[in-house]
């Protein structure tokens, strides 16, 4: 089983979505189940409704989970495992106060030494009124694991000192709950961000402590950088999946980009289902990947081209596929839904006769309306339409073409008129409307 384990403490980060996608792909490739585990153990930071938002996003991106679990539901099992570790002498109660540990950290800092917890401190401040934490004893030997991206990763015993697995309030820490749940659900392969590399030896130590001998596979994804080459943070708009969607980027384009960046792929534009056929986690680069919004814009435009006219019309809140055809004509100048919508809205909005070609618009308008109301046969062919409109209005050349474009689109520039005509003719009664300035 592979798992995606988000915390409901904020908006989904693009790095988290990338990890979800990779886990989903690997589950499909390996014929294993895809588990979504909501890690809701941090009660103070949990935000109501964020779990539903996460699940909704996974659905939107086409990732259907086989199992769903809330980590807090497993608290009884976590407590049981902690008691077992205590009974075996592999864990112990620690009464150190925050103030005591902060002092020890300052002392280590003053000596320019890394802070390490010493087991001998455990009962220095023992008090009958003080609730202890539970710590797992640190490593006694080197801990190594193979990372499918980074290669062999090792930690010396002094790098994994005794650490807290259960807090004073009885709530398990992240590492403890994570390690036990991975064991309970028989997770076989863990793909996550490289900020979790230092958690891996602790989780391995926990599993060894309870007698779990299965060797898990790991792949830690390099961090994402912003366009300035710095680590992407919440201050970067593109770090939020919600922001990308609100800006009008398609889920399939976002997924395409997150798979593509820092990776060797046989093609540049693809769907998630296509990536399942050839994806190889070992081809992901070790180096951090820079988020390039221009590249995402390009991919978004390419995925618009892949959509049927009906599907694109639906995204633009229209039912007629011809609206999707109109929208595709604007892909040379538009890359997102937010850029396409104003173009389509302008087509269907009443036009205002103003500027250099205002008089030509006012002259041409009644003749076009007459052709519409008379169901002129010329409305079926652009050349015939152009010829009849010129004859009726007496306009020709630039005044004719500019005023016609303005009456159709509200803009002096845009796609070829002959291309626009093929789709716009079905909506001439709604499109060719003139509102004189008040």
From Swiss-Prot:
Q: Which domain of life is it from?
A: Bacteria
Annotated residues that bind ATP are located at 234
Question: Where in the cell does this protein reside?
Answer: Cytoplasm
Q: Does the keyword Ligase apply?
A: yes
- Show the catalytic activity: tRNA(Glu) + L-glutamate + ATP = L-glutamyl-tRNA(Glu) + AMP + diphosphate
Quote the InterPro entries the UniProt record gives.
Answer: aa-tRNA-synth_I_cd-bd (IPR045462), aa-tRNA-synth_I_codon-bd_sub2 (IPR020751), aa_tRNA-synth_I_cd-bd_sf (IPR008925), Glu-tRNA-ligase_bac/mito (IPR004527), Glu/Gln-tRNA-synth (IPR000924), Glu/Gln-tRNA-synth_Ib_cat-dom (IPR020058), GluQ/Sye (IPR049940), Rossmann-like_a/b/a_fold (IPR014729)
Tell me the keywords, alphabetical order: Aminoacyl-tRNA synthetase, ATP-binding, Cytoplasm, Ligase, Nucleotide-binding, Protein biosynthesis
Q: Name any one GO molecular function.
A: ATP binding
Give the enzyme's EC designation.
6.1.1.17
Q: Which Gene Ontology BP annotations are present? A: glutamyl-tRNA aminoacylation
Q: Which parts of the sequence form the motif 'KMSKS' region? A: 231-235
Residues spanned by motif 'HIGH' region: 6-16
Q: Which GO terms describe its cellular component?
A: cytosol
* Function according to Swiss-Prot or TrEMBL: Catalyzes the attachment of glutamate to tRNA(Glu) in a two-step reaction: glutamate is first activated by ATP to form Glu-AMP and then transferred to the acceptor end of tRNA(Glu).
Q: What is said about its interaction partners and assembly?
A: Monomer.
Family, according to the entry, reads as follows: Belongs to the class-I aminoacyl-tRNA synthetase family. Glutamate--tRNA ligase type 1 subfamily.
Question: What is the recorded name of this protein?
Answer: Glutamate--tRNA ligase 2
Gene source species: Wolinella succinogenes (strain ATCC 29543 / DSM 1740 / CCUG 13145 / JCM 31913 / LMG 7466 / NCTC 11488 / FDC 602W) (Vibrio succinogenes)
What gene is behind this protein?
gltX2
